[in-house]
Amino acid sequence: MTLIDLANPTRFLALTTRVLPWLAAATVILLAIGLYQSALAPDDYQQGATVKIMFIHVPNAWLSMFVWGVMSIASLGTLVWRHPLADVAAKAAAPIGAAFTFLALLTGSLWGRPMWGTYWEWDARLTSVLILFLMYLGLMALWRAVEDPSRAARAAAVLTLVGAINLPIIKFSVDWWNTLHQPASVMRMGGSSLDKSFLIPLLVMAIAFTLLFVTLHLAAMRNEILRRRVRSLQMMQASRIAFSSEMGAGSRHDNASKEIGAA
Amino acid sequence: MTALSALIRRDIRIALRVGGGALIGVLFFLTVVVLMPFAVGPDLALLSRLGPAILWLGALLASLLTLDRLFMADHEDGSLDLITMSRTPLELACAAKALAHWLAAGLPLIVATPVLGLLLNLDMVATGAVALTLLAGTPALTFTGMIGAALAVTLHRGGLLMAVLVLPLSIPVLIFGVAASQAVIVGPMSFGAPFSILCALSLVSLVIGPFAAAASLRHGLD
Amino acid sequence: MTMSLGPYASFIVTSYAAAALVVAILIGWIVLDYRSQTRHLRELDRSGITRRSGRSAMDRP
């Protein structure tokens, strides 16, 4: 199965149908292992049991950026290499990435309440992720604003790439802005070198969520291909009806002109 | 070169006409600044603390408002197609249009800043600092906003979508613009660092903006 | 699984529950969308439309 084969939508659909059950199974297994390990993880010295939120929060935060990276590569595929399935990949990834970003924000907020005493904190990381979430929503709006999927694809591709350039800039700016305004408290994750008892569940959950993304993404791509097929078939059907009604209308036109003439 | 200068002159002339939108931007700027005390309260001390932020926010929103028409008017009367098809590279044409827009719509905002600074109880130094940062930062706003305008040009109700697309891109400019102004007013932080980053953002947008806008136009107008 | 989740247990549970809910919504949307598209394709196939390549709408790979 070379990359060229993947360019053919029908073959791609065949591939997904074969691969999806395995991916789904692997995702479920890894999620189960990860959840089990998270439950068994010890309490943090400072944070207590709330450190368990990290096992959901960090993978989602990581994925929110990873998905934008995937969309950026897909956008390059659309603009530079004109790969037929690139825009399908980009469009399918956006809602999934937005959902992960939302989860990162929500769990970050729920983690923050015990830690900082407030649900929202204009911390550099939370703020950058919030802006990323806004960008996801803007991108999804752009996809749906243009009727023709392939034209929408090109506009969305440009926006995705501009956003990719802008994300490091935003992170840096917000970091600067944050140090300028001296946050009320500084978030500690137990240090940058995580203890193994935290690191392993975290990595397992990260891999599990990544597999989840791949599974959902392939399934969503399949849906998008089918949706485009439906659209083109519906257009064919509509033109067929219009054509046949034109043929039938020919005689009706004569009658109409006769009536007008009579009147 | 003459094609580009003709484009710039044409755009400026159109923008400065009554329906052109350049001076409307200043009016909107004034409106936003006037509305702020109604929301925040007439406490002059508070207003002068918020002053740079209010001015920057007003300038950001005002330039967003006028960016909508950067390509829309040309698209409607067909001249955008002519520009796309002409021999001058589309990137340079986009840069020229953005420059014209900044001259016609951005500069008046900067000129209006000292007057509005008075309304917000800002002293000369503060107002000067804000005006200087606006001078350095509004090109960034215009050139990145142009990307959103180009993306939205083929959409009929594109205006609001364009604002949503452009705002995340303008956040760094806003952050550093206000940081630089505050550095002059409040003090311990240096002015130079955020100001040079602001200039850097503008310079980068001078390059990326036209390329991204041209790509959007090319793909969107097929 | 009895473990003490400490004084902030509700936050931990809400986080995991929210994650489960969002993932469930994603899966649900994808599954429903798939069913909707295949239903449309079946209806189009029944009305005799073929794709440009001549293959039927319900081309089951």
From Swiss-Prot, chain B:
Q: Name one GO molecular function term.
A: heme transmembrane transporter activity
Q: Where are the transmembrane segments?
A: 20-40, 44-64, 102-122, 134-154, 160-180, 195-215
Any single Pfam family the record assigns to this protein: CcmB
**InterPro entries given in the database record:** Cyt_c_biogenesis_CcmB, Cyt_c_CcmB_bac
Compartments where found:
Cell inner membrane
Q: Which UniProt keywords apply?
A: Cell inner membrane, Cell membrane, Cytochrome c-type biogenesis, Membrane, Transmembrane, Transmembrane helix, Transport
Highest taxon listed in the record's lineage: Bacteria
| Membrane topology term | Multi-pass membrane protein
A GO BP term here is:
cytochrome c biosynthetic process
NCBIfam families given for it? ccmB (TIGR01190)
Query: What name goes with this protein?
Result: Heme exporter protein B
Organism of provenance: Bradyrhizobium diazoefficiens (strain JCM 10833 / BCRC 13528 / IAM 13628 / NBRC 14792 / USDA 110)
Write the lineage as a comma-separated list. Bacteria, Pseudomonadati, Pseudomonadota, Alphaproteobacteria, Hyphomicrobiales
